[in-house]
Amino acid sequence: MAARSAIAHRWSVLPAEAGSPVGETGFYAGLDHPGTAARMTLYADAAPELALCAVASLREQIRIDDATHLVVASCTGFVAPGIDQIIARRLGLSPSIERVLIGFMGCYAAVAALRTARHIVRSEPDARVLVVTVELSTLHLQAVDEIEPLLAMLQFGDGAAAAMVSAEPRGLAIGQSFATTLAESDKLIRWDITDTGFAMHLSGEVPARIATALADRDLVKIIAAGQDPRAIDAWAVHAGGRSILDAVEHALMLDAATLDDSRAVLAANGNMSSATLMFVLARILARPRVEHGVALAFGPGLAAEGFAFGPAA
């Protein structure tokens, strides 16, 4: 199963010096897996650390100390004071910074975070919105032997990303957003809180349902802003899995190389939930000028969300 996933590497915050997470000294050692409380304790420590690493990389490219707003997305843990407050405090940001925490939305939460940042900047042109996505999926390994949950767990790894959204003419400009929820699809992707962490249910029907949805010309017209999908310069598709990327490629009749950025992120990192789309956008940001791009992600609902993007200047 792992060989067919198109994933070469996945990463975890679980300490390497402890050996294999499922070994005798690992986090999952023993017959009984850790309870949810133990997993949340680790999340409270490790999630801010990983988020700060992402912000440090961003800081090498752009100033962040004058951020007026902070938007954080995460679905792999809970802590109060919230991870948004922890990040703001650890970064030394103003105590008056306005914060938004987008929780438990799953893989398309980066769309919601960036969309929220865009709305803030449109209403307050001087705003500088720091956006952070951080996910620790490897804290939620489940002691199961059924094929479907095993396949789901094979997809996910840990990751974090950060971006600054402002009216400054730099980078990519976020355009019109879109969202849709598929009918009778609420059981296809689930993220349930249990006594032993969060349990992922990812139905094998998801790729086919996505392909069926993308066969709707009216929906594709909205997603592609009225253009032929093949005329879009850059498709930033959430790297949710090999079969999901294949479904999007075939349904939209895209060239084989169109989703190379998404496939590269999948191969190097696996599915990092909300952080994944940010990694894909970072690769596109490094390209020469992109005139017409579309970001597209899927998650619980089953829902699809995204936005158009283009040059900021």
Residue ranges and their predicted role:
Residues 1-42, 128, 143-212, 216, ...:
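Condensing-enzyme catalytic core mediating Claisen C-C bond formation in acyl metabolism
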Residues 3-7, 46-61, 116, 160, ...:
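Short, well-ordered amphipathic alpha-helical segments that serve as non-catalytic structural scaffolds
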Residues 4-93, 229-245:
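Conserved beta-ketoacyl condensing-enzyme motif
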Residues 26-27, 38, 42, 56-58, ...:
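A contiguous, well-structured pocket-lining segment that forms one wall/lid of small-molecule binding clefts
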Residues 34-35, 65-69, 91-103, 143-148, ...:
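Glycine/charged-rich beta-loop-alpha catalytic/anionic-binding loops adjacent to active sites
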Residues 75-76, 96, 101-122, 211, ...:
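Claisen-condensing/thiolase-fold acyl-transfer catalytic domains that form or cleave C-C bonds
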Residues 79-85, 131-151, 178-195, 242-250, ...:
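Active-site-adjacent elements of ketosynthase-type condensing enzymes
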Residues 95-96, 102, 109-116, 133-159:
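Active-site glycine-rich loop that binds ribose-phosphate moieties when present
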